[in-house]
Amino acid sequence: MYAVIKTGGKQYRVAAGENIKVEQIAADVGQEIVIDQVLAVGNGAELKVGTPLVSGASVKATVVAHGKRDKVHIFKMRRRKHYQKRQGHRQQFTELHIGAIAV
């Protein structure tokens, strides 16, 4: 069984037992959270799509870790003006372990 969930402004296809990295969630490591923004639920033969959400569906997940993704380098330059600017950014994430998908 799999589900399409929405968290942090993005959509993820998840199945029970998977680990996924999502945008940072304000929760402690080891805490169990319930994601109720489920857009679709399927089990291979049948697919239930919500308008926009599937009513009564939820996904239980456990917070495994918090961290930062790889650095993205930003480089700005104006030709012939001797202007150069370098900047970097590391986006924070939360790693979740998907437990159960309830319909």
From Swiss-Prot:
Gene Ontology biological process terms, A to Z: translation
SUPFAM superfamilies referenced in this protein's UniProt entry, alphabetically: L21p-like
A molecular function (GO) term: structural constituent of ribosome
InterPro entries: bL21-like (IPR028909), bL21-like_sf (IPR036164), Ribosomal_bL21 (IPR001787), Ribosomal_bL21_CS (IPR018258)
GO cellular component: cytoplasm; ribonucleoprotein complex; ribosome
Keywords: Ribonucleoprotein, Ribosomal protein, RNA-binding, rRNA-binding
PROSITE patterns assigned to the protein according to its UniProt record, in alphabetical order: RIBOSOMAL_L21
Record-linked Pfam families: Ribosomal_L21p (PF00829)
NCBIfam families to which the protein is assigned, alphabetical: L21 (TIGR00061)
Function statement: This protein binds to 23S rRNA in the presence of protein L20.
Subunit and interaction comment: Part of the 50S ribosomal subunit. Contacts protein L20.
HAMAP family: Ribosomal_bL21
Family indicated by similarity: Belongs to the bacterial ribosomal protein bL21 family.
Protein name: Large ribosomal subunit protein bL21
Species this protein is from: Verminephrobacter eiseniae (strain EF01-2)
Underlying gene: rplU
